[in-house]
């Protein structure tokens, strides 16, 4: 009886030790985020330089995506400024990750308009792809299918209603987690990018 109890106690202690090690590994950035597992659908859109950027071009890279438009009078300036700060944090950490901004107002957001807009927030567009070159219906369907986010036109104005999340995508093109784009947890995002880059 005592022997059986001792074996059970040892088993419980072993499980607790394993759990503690796992928790520490994740907190140190060793754990890869996996609360989402959504494959991004295939795409090939036009970037701010007039070139084509698609899912195949991003394969093998870690990237962070969000939705925006240049005529946005509400959340987009904050989201884009926060994405620019994330770009700076990524560089400071010595990491590599691409940033992808999908326009939800492609009829107005030409490549030139996107380049001018993003240029207000950063001088470095080398790893930032601001994308357009599709119909509103296309980006609406793409957002819903690939990012599980709703995109719709404002019935009484020229604004577009869209989500405010930043999406972290791994090298295989799978969304692994998302963050509040209005108040990003920069240190956590950096840890996650580091974990995915190993």
What function would you assign to each model-found segment?
Residues 40-41, 62-63, 163-165:
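Short loop/turn microsegments at loop-to-beta-strand junctions
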Residues 1-46, 196-198:
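N-terminal targeting signals for export/organelle localization
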Residues 80-142:
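Structural microenvironment flanking redox-active thiols in thiol-disulfide oxidoreductases
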Residues 43-62, 87:
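A short beta-strand-turn-helix
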Residues 55-77, 83:
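Short active-site neighborhood of thiol/selenol oxidoreductases, capturing the structured segment around
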Residues 128, 140, 144-152, 160-167:
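Structural micro-motif
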Residues 153-198:
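Thiol-/selenol-based redox modules, centered on thioredoxin-like
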């Amino acid at each position: 009886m005592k022997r059986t109890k001792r074996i059970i106690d040892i088993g419980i202690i072993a499980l607790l030790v394993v759990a503690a090690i796992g928790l520490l590994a994740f907190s140190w950035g060793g754990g890869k985020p996996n609360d989402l597992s959504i494959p991004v659908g295939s795409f090939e859109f036009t970037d701010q330089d007039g070139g084509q950027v698609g899912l195949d071009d991003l394969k093998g890279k870690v990237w962070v995506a969000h939705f925006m438009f240049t005529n946005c009078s509400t959340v987009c300036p904050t989201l884009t400024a926060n994405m620019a700060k994330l770009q700076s944090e990524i560089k400071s950490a010595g990491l590599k990750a691409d940033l992808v901004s999908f326009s939800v107002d492609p009829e107005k957001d030409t490549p030139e308009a996107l380049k001018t807009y993003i240029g207000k927030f950063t001088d470095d567009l080398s790893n930032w792809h601001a994308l357009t070159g599709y119909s509103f219906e296309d980006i609406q369907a793409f957002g819903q299918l690939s990012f599980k986010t709703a995109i719709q036109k404002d019935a009484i104005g020229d604004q577009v209603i869209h989500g405010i999340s930043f999406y972290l995508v791994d090298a295989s093109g799978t969304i692994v987690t998302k963050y509040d784009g209005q108040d990003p947890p920069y240190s956590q995002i950096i840890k996650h990018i580091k974990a995915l880059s190993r």
